[in-house]
């Protein structure tokens, strides 16, 4: 593609996403009128694709100067990045397929604008800020974190006394994790797997590692596709819930022997290891739905492999002697490294929370540490989404309100 064609392609993708994100459209309209971010700089490290671009445009419409880099080497869509870079008050430093050095160099370029507010997906930007650019922390009003993995990382920093700025855990908003993590991950993970493998899911043993909100979504959609789902877990309550939802539950050491297709969704490392690879079926397929590429032990798989080859775009086959194992998208985030990410309708809510939380940070002085999304913002996003869908809800009568706040009325 020429640069012009690249920009046109990105603009078309952004228009499509924009037309399916009505909540963010309402917020953008308010931002354009009120300019709540005028004079502020926002530094972002997110998956640079069409839905993210709509959020970036919304912040710029609110008066912010925005700089953005990627948060995964394989999730950037270069046409969207090119289109974003043509917008006023927006600089995009992301590119697809960058090496580790280039990845962090792009984050450095975002930090070079000296942002007042940050938005992260995985906390790499905040980590870089604390590790190498500490002199900037005094200027930072706060940040937002998009994903479960990043929130875990921030809580660990806070526990160690290392977090020196306020960060809102956008991931923990109900209008984020109940929809984005469950329905978004459930649909987009299988979109990435199906478009990459072009294989039938029905009748296969699908092993889902982790039964948090992302894992539930993956398991739910696998069931809908006709798979026999096996869940592995470390949490007894989640394991019990998975069983009551109709899935088989067992240790990974046992599941590894019978799985046809594996999807990791834990947010932790070394979920699939050398011991697992050695007992897997010939032709087993591995995909990761967690943020970082550490859930599948790729170093161990590389060391076991006698040879490797690309058998299909985005699928690498590892011949470990008596069996072949196929890995999708280098073990990176399958829904974005092998697909287009979550549907626009769920990202509409997630990014609405991001935009509102950026404004909240700009208008309120927060203490250092991890903060929840204010309940009123969470509820506001839900109401706007319902209105956009033409759905009305009931309201409590005065008698019902009195009953719910009282204690004297019993049997």
From Swiss-Prot:
What family is it from?
Belongs to the adenosylhomocysteinase family.
Compartments it resides in: Cytoplasm
For this protein, the record's PROSITE patterns field holds:
ADOHCYASE_1, ADOHCYASE_2
Listed GO MF terms:
adenosylhomocysteinase activity; trialkylsulfonium hydrolase activity
Pathway as given in its UniProt record:
Amino-acid biosynthesis; S-adenosyl-L-methionine biosynthesis
| Binding site residues for NAD(+) | 147-149, 181, 210-215, 233, 268, 289-291, 335
Catalytic activities: S-inosyl-L-homocysteine + H2O = L-homocysteine + inosine
- Enzyme class (EC, first level): hydrolase
Q: Quote additional remarks.
A: SAH is a product of SAM methyltransferases and is known to be a feedback inhibitor of these enzymes. As a result of this inhibition, organisms have evolved efficient enzymes to metabolize SAH via different pathways. The pathway found in methanogens differs from the canonical pathway, it uses the deamination of S-adenosyl-L-homocysteine to form S-inosyl-L-homocysteine for the regeneration of SAM from S-adenosyl-L-homocysteine.
Cofactor(s) recorded in Swiss-Prot or TrEMBL: NAD(+)
Enumerate the residues binding substrate.
121, 146, 176, 180
Is Nucleus set as a keyword in this record?
no
| EC number annotated for this UniProt entry | 3.13.1.9
Recorded GO cellular component terms are: cytosol
- What is the name of the protein in this document? S-inosyl-L-homocysteine hydrolase
Q: Any idea which UniProt keywords this protein has?
A: Cytoplasm, Hydrolase, NAD, One-carbon metabolism
What is the phylogenetic placement of the source species in the record? Archaea, Methanobacteriati, Methanobacteriota, Stenosarchaea group, Methanomicrobia
Quote the function comment for this protein.
Catalyzes the hydrolysis of S-inosyl-L-homocysteine (SIH) to L-homocysteine (Hcy) and inosine. Likely functions in a S-adenosyl-L-methionine (SAM) recycling pathway from S-adenosyl-L-homocysteine (SAH) produced from SAM-dependent methylation reactions. Can also catalyze the reverse reaction in vitro, i.e. the synthesis of SIH from Hcy and inosine.
Q: Which CDD domains match?
A: SAHH (cd00401)
Give the superkingdom in one word.
Archaea
The answer to whether UniProt assigns keyword Membrane to this entry is: no
Cofactor binding note? Binds 1 NAD(+) per subunit.
GO biological process annotation, one example: one-carbon metabolic process
């Amino acid at each position: 593609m020429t640069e012009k064609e690249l920009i046109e392609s990105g603009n078309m993708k952004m228009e499509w996403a924009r037309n399916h994100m009505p909540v963010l459209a309402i917020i953008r309209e308010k931002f354009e009128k009120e300019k709540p971010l005028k004079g502020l700089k926002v530094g972002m490290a997110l998956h640079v694709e069409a839905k993210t671009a709509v959020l970036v445009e919304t912040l710029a419409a609110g008066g912010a100067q925005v700089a953005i880099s990627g948060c995964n080497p394989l999730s950037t869509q270069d046409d969207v990045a090119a289109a974003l870079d043509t917008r006023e008050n927006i600089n995009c430093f992301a590119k697809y397929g960058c090496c580790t050095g280039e990845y962090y160099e792009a984050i450095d370029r975002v930090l070079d604008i000296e942002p007042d507010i940050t938005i992260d997906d995985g906390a790499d930007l905040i980590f870089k800020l604390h590790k190498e650019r500490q002199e900037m922390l005094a200027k930072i009003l706060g940040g937002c974190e998009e994903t479960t993995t990043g929130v875990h990382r921030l809580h660990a920093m806070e526990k160690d006394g290392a977090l020196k700025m306020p960060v809102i855990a956008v991931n923990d908003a109900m209008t984020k994790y109940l929809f984005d993590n469950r329905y978004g991950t459930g649909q987009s993970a299988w979109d990435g797997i199906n478009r990459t493998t072009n294989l039938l899911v029905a009748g296969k043993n699908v092993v889902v590692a982790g039964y948090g909100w992302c894992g539930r979504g993956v398991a739910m959609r696998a069931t809908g596709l006709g798979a026999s789902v096996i869940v592995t877990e470390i949490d007894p309550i989640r394991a019990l819930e998975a069983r009551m939802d109709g899935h088989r539950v067992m240790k990974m050491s046992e599941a590894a022997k019978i799985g046809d297709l594996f999807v990791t969704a834990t947010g932790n490392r070394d979920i699939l290891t050398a011991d697992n690879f050695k007992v897997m079926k010939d032709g087993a397929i591995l995909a990761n739905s967690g943020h970082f590429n550490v859930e599948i032990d790729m170093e161990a798989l590389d060391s076991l492999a006698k040879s490797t080859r690309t058998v299909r775009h985005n699928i690498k086959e590892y011949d470990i002697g008596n069996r072949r194992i196929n890995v999708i998208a280098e073990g990176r985030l399958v829904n974005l490294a092998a697909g287009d990410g979550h549907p626009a309708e769920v990202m509409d809510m997630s990014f609405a929370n991001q935009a509102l939380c950026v404004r909240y940070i700009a208008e309120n002085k927060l203490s250092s540490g991890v903060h929840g999304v204010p309940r009123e913002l969470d509820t506001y996003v839900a109401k706007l989404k319902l209105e956009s869908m033409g759905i009305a809800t009931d309201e409590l009568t005065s008698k019902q309100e009195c009953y719910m706040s009282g204690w004297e009325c019993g049997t």
